[in-house]
Regions:
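A solvent-exposed, acidic/Ser-Thr-rich amphipathic alpha-helical stretch
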Residues: 29-78
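A short, structure-level motif marking secondary-structure boundaries and short turns
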Residues: 5-6, 41, 90
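Phosphate-binding glycine-rich loops and adjacent basic patches that engage nucleotide phosphates
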Residues: 13-24, 49, 67-72, 91-92
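A beta-strand edge to alpha-helix "cap/lid" segment located at domain peripheries
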Residues: 57-133
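Hydrophobic pocket/interface hotspot
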Residues: 9-12, 23-25, 32, 48, ...
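Short, low-complexity N-terminal intrinsically disordered segments enriched in polar/charged residues
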Residues: 1-22, 26, 30, 132-133
Protein backbone atom coordinates (compact mmCIF):
# COMPACT_ATOMS: atom_id res chain seq x y z
CA UNK A 1 0.00 0.00 0.00
CA UNK A 2 1.44 3.41 -0.91
CA UNK A 3 2.41 5.79 1.87
CA UNK A 4 0.10 8.67 2.69
CA UNK A 5 1.35 12.21 2.16
CA UNK A 6 1.69 12.59 5.94
CA UNK A 7 3.76 9.38 6.19
CA UNK A 8 6.04 10.59 3.38
CA UNK A 9 6.71 13.92 5.09
CA UNK A 10 7.09 12.41 8.58
CA UNK A 11 9.76 10.05 7.17
CA UNK A 12 11.90 13.08 6.24
CA UNK A 13 12.06 14.32 9.86
CA UNK A 14 11.70 11.45 12.32
CA UNK A 15 14.61 9.09 11.69
CA UNK A 16 18.37 9.41 11.77
CA UNK A 17 19.92 12.18 9.69
CA UNK A 18 20.99 9.68 7.02
CA UNK A 19 17.59 7.95 6.81
CA UNK A 20 15.79 11.33 6.71
CA UNK A 21 18.01 12.43 3.82
CA UNK A 22 17.43 9.13 1.99
CA UNK A 23 13.65 9.41 2.41
CA UNK A 24 13.70 13.04 1.29
CA UNK A 25 15.68 12.29 -1.87
CA UNK A 26 13.34 9.40 -2.71
CA UNK A 27 10.26 11.61 -2.22
CA UNK A 28 11.39 14.65 -4.24
CA UNK A 29 10.02 14.98 -7.75
CA UNK A 30 12.55 15.54 -10.50
CA UNK A 31 11.64 19.22 -10.91
CA UNK A 32 10.76 20.00 -7.29
CA UNK A 33 10.62 23.72 -6.42
CA UNK A 34 12.31 24.35 -3.06
CA UNK A 35 12.09 27.81 -1.45
CA UNK A 36 14.21 28.78 1.52
CA UNK A 37 12.98 31.94 3.28
CA UNK A 38 14.30 35.33 2.23
CA UNK A 39 16.76 36.45 4.89
CA UNK A 40 17.73 32.85 5.71
CA UNK A 41 21.43 32.18 4.98
CA UNK A 42 20.51 29.88 2.08
CA UNK A 43 17.46 31.88 0.99
CA UNK A 44 16.18 31.51 -2.55
CA UNK A 45 14.30 29.11 -4.78
CA UNK A 46 16.06 26.03 -6.11
CA UNK A 47 14.73 23.74 -8.83
CA UNK A 48 15.63 20.05 -8.84
CA UNK A 49 17.26 17.69 -6.37
CA UNK A 50 20.86 18.55 -7.33
CA UNK A 51 20.35 22.30 -6.80
CA UNK A 52 18.72 21.69 -3.41
CA UNK A 53 21.44 19.35 -2.21
CA UNK A 54 24.22 21.68 -3.36
CA UNK A 55 22.76 24.98 -2.13
CA UNK A 56 21.03 23.86 1.06
CA UNK A 57 21.86 20.46 2.49
CA UNK A 58 25.58 20.27 1.70
CA UNK A 59 26.01 23.69 3.33
CA UNK A 60 23.95 22.74 6.38
CA UNK A 61 26.15 19.67 6.78
CA UNK A 62 29.47 21.47 6.32
CA UNK A 63 28.77 24.77 8.15
CA UNK A 64 26.80 23.57 11.20
CA UNK A 65 27.24 21.11 14.06
CA UNK A 66 24.24 18.99 14.98
CA UNK A 67 21.80 20.98 12.81
CA UNK A 68 18.28 19.62 13.36
CA UNK A 69 14.72 20.31 12.32
CA UNK A 70 12.48 18.94 15.09
CA UNK A 71 8.76 18.90 14.31
CA UNK A 72 6.26 19.60 17.09
CA UNK A 73 3.08 19.31 15.01
CA UNK A 74 1.87 18.25 11.57
CA UNK A 75 -1.23 19.56 9.80
CA UNK A 76 -2.83 17.83 6.83
CA UNK A 77 -4.87 20.17 4.64
CA UNK A 78 -8.13 18.40 3.78
CA UNK A 79 -8.84 18.05 0.07
CA UNK A 80 -5.36 19.24 -0.86
CA UNK A 81 -2.07 17.40 -1.21
CA UNK A 82 -0.50 19.74 1.36
CA UNK A 83 1.23 18.97 4.66
CA UNK A 84 2.34 21.68 7.08
CA UNK A 85 5.04 20.99 9.67
CA UNK A 86 5.67 23.28 12.66
CA UNK A 87 8.86 22.92 14.65
CA UNK A 88 12.20 24.20 15.83
CA UNK A 89 15.60 24.33 14.14
CA UNK A 90 18.63 23.96 16.39
CA UNK A 91 22.36 23.61 16.02
CA UNK A 92 25.69 25.34 16.36
CA UNK A 93 27.47 27.37 13.72
CA UNK A 94 30.99 25.94 13.34
CA UNK A 95 32.72 29.24 12.59
CA UNK A 96 31.39 31.03 15.71
CA UNK A 97 30.55 28.17 18.04
CA UNK A 98 27.21 29.88 18.76
CA UNK A 99 24.11 27.75 19.33
CA UNK A 100 20.60 28.70 18.27
CA UNK A 101 16.96 27.61 18.30
CA UNK A 102 14.48 29.12 15.82
CA UNK A 103 10.83 28.32 15.13
CA UNK A 104 9.92 27.21 11.61
CA UNK A 105 6.93 26.29 9.49
CA UNK A 106 7.38 24.12 6.39
CA UNK A 107 4.68 23.84 3.74
CA UNK A 108 4.92 20.75 1.55
CA UNK A 109 2.92 20.18 -1.64
CA UNK A 110 2.75 16.68 -3.10
CA UNK A 111 1.47 15.13 -6.33
CA UNK A 112 1.13 11.38 -6.81
CA UNK A 113 3.25 10.66 -3.73
CA UNK A 114 6.09 12.99 -4.74
CA UNK A 115 7.09 16.34 -3.25
CA UNK A 116 6.66 19.02 -5.92
CA UNK A 117 7.00 22.14 -3.79
CA UNK A 118 8.50 23.14 -0.43
CA UNK A 119 8.34 26.54 1.25
CA UNK A 120 10.14 27.51 4.45
CA UNK A 121 9.07 30.14 6.98
CA UNK A 122 11.58 30.80 9.77
CA UNK A 123 12.80 33.46 12.16
CA UNK A 124 15.96 33.97 10.13
CA UNK A 125 17.23 36.76 12.42
CA UNK A 126 18.01 34.20 15.14
CA UNK A 127 19.89 32.00 12.66
CA UNK A 128 21.92 34.93 11.31
CA UNK A 129 22.82 36.04 14.85
CA UNK A 130 24.38 32.61 15.47
CA UNK A 131 26.51 33.15 12.36
CA UNK A 132 27.85 36.57 13.41
CA UNK A 133 31.42 36.68 14.66
Amino acid sequence: MPKSNLEIIRSTYEGSASSNAKHLEEALSEKVEWTEAEGFPYGGTYIGVEAIMENVFSRLGSEWDDYKASVNMYHEVNGKDVIIAEGVYSGGYKETGKLFEADFVHVWQLENGKIVKFKQYVDSYIVREAMKV
